[in-house]
Amino acid sequence: SGKDGKREFCGPDGFPPAVPKLFENKGTLNQGIPTFQDTTVASGLASHPGPGLGVACYDFDGDGWVDIFFADDAKPNRLFMNQQNGKFEEQALKRGIALDAMGQTKANMGVGVVDINSDGLIDIFVTHLVTERHTLWQQGPQGMFSDRTAPLGLNQSSWRGTGFGAVMADFDNNGFSD
């Protein structure tokens, strides 16, 4: 049941946490058919299930290896940093992106990755339900993220809607990401 004591049918607490799946591309067979191997357990992803609604795969720390961010619904986000040996280490809390600036979880859904302030570091924008403000985490030195939603005035946004997806781009063609 939910926090209000009523039974939930579709809420995040109504289902067990899901284990994300990771498949490694092993190349192609003789007839050009691609083959994949399930490396979920060996990679370390299986040890951290969650109600992920959004995902972004990107080299967040600039080491040349792809990392994985999960926007989790009403639970702390997960950030798996590639250890360059086939394994990932969950570091969302350590890097400041598990919770918002108030230490709370949100109905995290859509994920957009962008260098919003042109400092060479990738930032993460996450959308939520209509009753919540979307969140922008800016990356700082040593790969630490901070919730910059309020300081950047995004908590005063005039648009309020459920955001199941997010796309970051230079929509007005002025050389800066929007």
Task: Describe each region flagged by the PLM.
Residues S1-D178:
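Acidic, glycine/proline-rich Ca2+-coordinating loop motifs
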